């Protein structure tokens, strides 16, 4: 006979516990689940006493401090307070399983979606927490409903909220593949063909030929005039998987979208994510975001409709200041020979049965080198299987993860060595456009820093976890070290970078020249893996000096105004959108390129009420930033001339951009890395422009700046010009220069003569891996070829020239010395023809 113990407690009703700390004591936990950690208890207590009535709250805990349990306890507390239903959202299905396992371990009741069922009744009745993944909630055909047809929720919690926000943006985006959706791709391509030719004929030809890296933005005025045709094309194909889930969100909001076209896909994405379309989230009584301590949360202001106050004032445990052990190693600082290729080659050769090694790379292209060396390359379909293999102890080969910096946990032996390979790459065309247009933007650089920090954190998942992190790739090293961008990292990461620089210097001092530099790098890793007491004490003492001295930023206010302006525009309140954007420009923007970016938004807001005024504003935007949309009329080419110029003073002016020699050297290393075959055209041409300025020439990119003319144009003393046509993306196995490429070169030579006259002195170069001109092709002018070896020779001489500058301050660097160094390294204008180029060979039939 079962005894009714509750009856013995007289007639009192036992109210469920609402204090999450007390609640934890009542749970039927498994024996492996011990007491709450101090950090968990501190955060839970503070939430219960001070924050539990707030609508919006960000909770920040160190990795490994148990934020999953904290989140589950908060939701159970709210359920016990009759403030359900409560929803726990993970960034992917893989992490749903992990959270469910945690809930089982701690005895917290939960429910999940069955394969074919609707929303569980246990969730709707406020009985159990519903654990699901972000794609299930945020899509145009969400089971939770959209707009006014949403399912009521009491509390929504986003776990790993930074990973979730990217997925939410993708929910509003249609991405149409050229290969799998050729019909829709072709129709949209044809629809905007004439408009895109006006924006840049060369780029449009590259897109038509299927170039992956080239992309263009459809002008907002063309999008507006042809939106009905776009809707017809999309509506007819709405059942296609690439359109199906986003279509309900787009179909009545098409004017608030922008279209980007590349050689491989078309992307239609919103200027601003309308999170209010998902009422289950936007109308929830409480919205809780879980975030790591190293992450910058400012983007929640625009992306999730949070107030700046909520973002600036998270709930966090102030002690300890840091968690886990990260040995950051920058091999190129140990020795120049420890470059990207050497590290990849050496570490792909290493075989170990004791721990896992991971490489995080930014693109599919970056995977190829690892693949050729026998590494395991993960795909979207295989990634979690490969991660499980690592956790089971299968450490046979290095595992490569492509462009995924979040939502991955690799604790303990599953990852003891992490290679962070090259600067993260934005996959979305909208993000790539903003990065290209505003490379110095605080917003863009914060997002890049955030991706890097997410990557760094993959291998250290707890207080006692440790991992060696190798940082390779000149652009990435520069971003992490440079004064201009290092400030965008958290205090924790900045300190770890400082430690990395210091141990590289220590290694240099103890470096035995008979030893291979890469062995020095490996010996550093061994010290950490073998738990060297000196290293552990040094790391701990350095990290304990950590001070969070972040300065106040205007980024919150800027993101708020961006969001408000877009909301006004989408509601048809054009005047308020215009005044909000004008205020943002006047009060918060200093940099001219960024001012141009915001002027373009202002021109777009003005377009519905005054086309003429919109064109004038777009002209102003384009003059400040030539990476933006070319206005429909009124842009003239500005010729370059060396009159009143002094080459040596120009070189000094270039050097003055940098606060010290180290900053200059970092910048030049990154530029020279981009001046390589295989680099995407935009980066290569930008690097060549920078090299022209470094060498004291007037340097221009006509094709980018006015959509006509050569890729690069330099002007030197006595108005001697160097004209460059760049083909950095041409395969190195290509046997000949095509008739089309020769014709393109001829057109650009003709443009130059039209602008500068037939008597202008100029050398004309094509940078391409082959010197053989197709029999069908012909050049109308004398053209010289720069191939790999000549390009490498030029880069070596530039690097040598910059190294020679190290002992000098600007004041000490005389004209004579500077001129001698330029001559020594063959960097005068006549050297380009004589030293770094060769004649082409015209193939016979």
Predicted stretch roles:
Residues 2-60:
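Conserved pre-motif I regulatory segment
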Residues 97-98, 103-148, 385-390:
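Inter-Walker segment of RecA-like/P-loop motor cores
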Residues 56-58, 62, 152-155, 160-339, ...:
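Conserved coupling segment at the C-terminus of the helicase ATP-binding
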Residues 618-621, 625-679:
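Interdomain/boundary linker segments immediately adjacent to catalytic/signaling cores
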Residues 68, 138-151, 159, 164, ...:
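SF2 helicase motor core recognition
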Residues 389-478, 730-731, 765, 769:
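Conserved RecA-like P-loop NTPase helicase motor core
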Residues 364-367, 383-389, 394, 422, ...:
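Catalytic core segments in nucleotide and nucleic-acid processing enzymes
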Residues 65-114, 136-139, 294-299, 360-367:
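Conserved Walker A/P-loop ATP-binding site and its immediately adjacent core
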């Amino acid at each position: 006979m079962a005894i009714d113990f509750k009856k013995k407690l007289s007639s009192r009703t036992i109210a469920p516990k609402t204090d999450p700390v007390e609640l934890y004591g009542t749970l039927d936990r498994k024996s492996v689940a011990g007491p709450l950690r101090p950090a968990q208890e501190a955060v839970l207590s503070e939430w219960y006493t001070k924050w539990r009535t707030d609508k919006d709250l960000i909770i920040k805990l160190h990795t490994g401090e148990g934020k999953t349990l904290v989140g589950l306890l908060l939701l159970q507390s709210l359920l016990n307070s009759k403030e359900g239903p409560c929803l726990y959202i993970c960034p992917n299905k893989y992490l749903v399983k992990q959270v469910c396992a945690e809930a089982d371990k701690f005895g917290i009741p939960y429910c999940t979606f069955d394969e074919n069922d609707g929303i569980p009744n246990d969730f709707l009745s406020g009985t159990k927490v519903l654990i699901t993944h972000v794609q299930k909630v945020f899509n145009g055909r969400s089971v939770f409903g959209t707009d006014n047809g949403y399912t009521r929720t009491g509390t929504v919690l986003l776990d790993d909220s930074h990973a979730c926000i990217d997925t939410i943006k993708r929910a509003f985006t249609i991405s149409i593949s050229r290969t799998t959706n050729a019909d829709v791709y072709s129709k949209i391509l044809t629809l905007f063909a004439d408009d895109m030719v006006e924006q840049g004929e060369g780029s449009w030809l590259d897109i038509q030929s299927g170039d992956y890296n080239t992309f263009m933005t459809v002008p907002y005025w063309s999008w507006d005039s042809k939106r009905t045709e776009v809707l017809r094309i999309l509506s007819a194909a709405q059942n296609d998987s690439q359109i199906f889930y986003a279509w309900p969100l787009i179909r009545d909001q098409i004017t608030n979208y922008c279209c980007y076209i590349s050689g491989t896909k078309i992307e239609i994405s919103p200027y601003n994510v309308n999170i209010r379309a998902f009422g289950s989230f936007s109308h929830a009584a409480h919205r809780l975001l879980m975030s790591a301590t190293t992450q910058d949360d400012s983007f929640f202001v625009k992306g999730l409709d949070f107030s700046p106050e909520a973002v600036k004032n998270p709930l966090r445990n102030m002690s300890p200041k840091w968690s886990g052990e990260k040995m950051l190693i920058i091999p190129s600082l140990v020795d120049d020979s420890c470059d990207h290729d050497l590290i990849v080659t050496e570490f792909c050769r290493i075989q170990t049965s004791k721990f896992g090694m991971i490489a995080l790379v930014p693109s599919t292209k970056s995977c190829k080198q690892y693949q050729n060396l026998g590494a395991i390359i993960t795909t979207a379909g295989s990634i979690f299987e490969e991660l499980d293999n690592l956790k089971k102890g299968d450490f046979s080969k290095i595992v490569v993860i492509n462009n995924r910096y979040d939502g991955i946990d690799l604790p303990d032996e599953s990852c003891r060595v992490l290679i962070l390979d090259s600067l993260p790459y934005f996959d979305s065309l909208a993000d790539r456009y903003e990065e290209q247009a505003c490379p110095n933007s605080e917003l863009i650089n914060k997002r890049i820093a955030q991706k890097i920090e997410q990557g760094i954190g993959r291998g250290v998942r707890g207080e006692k976890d440790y991992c060696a992190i190798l940082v390779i790739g000149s652009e990435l090293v520069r971003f992490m070290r440079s004064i201009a961008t290092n400030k965008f990292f958290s205090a924790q990461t900045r300190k770890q970078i400082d430690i990395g620089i210091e141990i590289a210097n220590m290694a240099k001092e103890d470096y035995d020249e008979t030893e291979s530099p890469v062995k020095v790098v490996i010996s550093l890793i061994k010290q950490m893996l073998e738990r060297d007491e000196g290293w552990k004490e040094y790391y701990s003492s350095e990290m304990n000096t950590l001070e969070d001295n972040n300065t106040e930023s205007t980024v919150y206010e800027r993101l708020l105004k961006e969001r408000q302006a877009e909301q006004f525009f989408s509601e048809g309140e054009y005047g308020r959108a215009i005044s909000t954007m004008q205020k943002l420009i006047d009060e918060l923007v200093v940099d001219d390129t960024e001012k141009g970016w915001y002027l373009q938004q202002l021109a777009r807001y003005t377009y519905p009420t005054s086309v003429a005024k919109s064109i004038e504003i777009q002209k102003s935007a384009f003059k400040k930033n030539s990476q933006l949309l070319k206005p429909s009329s009124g842009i003239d080419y500005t010729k370059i001339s060396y009159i009143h110029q002094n080459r040596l003073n120009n070189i000094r002016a270039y050097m003055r951009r940098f606060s010290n020699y180290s900053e200059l050297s970092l910048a030049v290393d990154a530029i020279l890395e981009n001046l390589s075959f295989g680099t995407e055209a935009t980066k290569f041409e930008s690097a060549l422009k920078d090299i022209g300025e470094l060498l004291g020439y007037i340097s221009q990119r006509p094709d980018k700046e006015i959509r006509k003319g050569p890729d690069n144009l330099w002007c030197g003393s006595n108005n001697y010009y160097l004209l460059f046509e760049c083909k950095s993306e041409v395969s190195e196995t290509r046997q000949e220069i095509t008739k089309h490429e020769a014709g393109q070169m001829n057109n650009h030579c003709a443009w130059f003569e039209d602008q500068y006259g037939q008597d202008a002195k100029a050398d004309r170069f094509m940078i391409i891996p082959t010197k053989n001109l197709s029999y069908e092709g012909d050049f109308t002018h004398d053209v010289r070829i720069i191939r790999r070896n000549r390009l490498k020779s030029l880069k070596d001489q530039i690097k040598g020239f910059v190294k020679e500058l190290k002992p000098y301050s600007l004041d000490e660097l005389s004209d004579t010395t500077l001129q001698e160094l330029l001559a020594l390294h063959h960097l005068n204008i006549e050297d380009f023809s004589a030293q770094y180029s060769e004649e082409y060979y015209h193939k016979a039939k």
